[in-house]
Amino acid sequence: MDEHPPPPFPTVGIIGKPGDPAIAGLVERLLPMLEARGCTALLDEQSMPETGDDRHPQRVSRETLLDACDLIIAIGGDGTLIHIARAVAGRRDVALMGINRGRLGFLVDIAPEHLDEVAQILDGQHVVDERLLLHAEIRSNEDDTLLREDVAINEVVLHRWNTARMIELVTRIDGEPLSDHRSDGLILATPTGSTAYAMAGGGPIVHPNLHAMLLVPVCPHTLSNRPLVVDGSSRIEIDVHPRFIEHVRVSCDSQNDLTLQAGSRLVVRAHPSPVRLVHPPGYSYFNLLRAKLGWGGPLCNIEPFGA
């Protein structure tokens, strides 16, 4: 008797954007794909509606799902996948893929009408894409004690929050002074985040295969303070002038805030475990940029080449 090889992803979890009525229909279409390939399906009880299907898989807690799955399918926008990526950081080697029910979709790149691409991924036909994560730490200046920590796949932002005044920052990279400047804040971004807040702040687009970090000042008072790209193994430390310490917050992917206090500083470096995304065959980052940023459209009022 022929034995079927084990599926590339034996246990698959599905997490959806809460409150989206279209998710139930997508789940109904995904379940037969998983069943046909011998995959165990787990639904996130926090976000997934009841399907009413006799083949209804287990609805489990978010923690159970994150610990058990080899692949997690995120149904929603980029924010949904970012939330999941932050949650799995450092847990285990779990892959993430996204079905786009949001707007832009830089990370969730499978359209609901193209679920055949999900089938290809489940069959092992996929592009693996490892993305750098940032580890943000609030540390004591006195003895370097870790006070608070979080992770980010897009960016860590030190920003003013309860004042209209600029804040004063001192930045060091690997212990070497970089700048003392006044601004509305500082964006510390991954290559993934280079097409998010950092791009809006005038930073460059950095290919996600590069092991790098971006420093992008937010409205700096001195125009010579420009965006900077540094090696991904760098340790970035930021001190806030004591006069402004109560007026700043540290935001991780705009999903969680850390508070600085007198005598503490922000330390940002690469997380030891990257996020593993999987894309359908033929995935191209440059095609994604063309589609999402409108680079592929015709030039206005210019005859096409060869016309």
Curated annotation (Swiss-Prot):
GO biological process: NAD metabolic process; NADP biosynthetic process
Active site per UniProt: 78
Cellular component annotations (GO), alphabetically ordered: cytoplasm
Binding site residues for NAD(+): 78-79, 83, 154-155, 165, 182, 184, 255
Keyword terms, alphabetized: ATP-binding, Cytoplasm, Kinase, NAD, NADP, Nucleotide-binding, Transferase
EC number(s) given by UniProt: 2.7.1.23
Reactions catalysed, as given in the entry: NAD(+) + ATP = ADP + NADP(+) + H(+)
Domain of life: Bacteria
One Pfam family in the UniProt entry: NAD_kinase_C
Top EC class of this enzyme: transferase
GO terms for MF: ATP binding; metal ion binding; NAD binding; NAD+ kinase activity
Keyword Transferase: yes
Subcellular location: Cytoplasm
Cofactor dependency: a divalent metal cation
Function: Involved in the regulation of the intracellular balance of NAD and NADP, and is a key enzyme in the biosynthesis of NADP. Catalyzes specifically the phosphorylation on 2'-hydroxyl of the adenosine moiety of NAD to yield NADP.
Recorded family membership: Belongs to the NAD kinase family.
NCBIfam families associated with the record: PRK01231.1 (NF002306)
Name this polypeptide is given: NAD kinase
Organism: Halorhodospira halophila (strain DSM 244 / SL1)
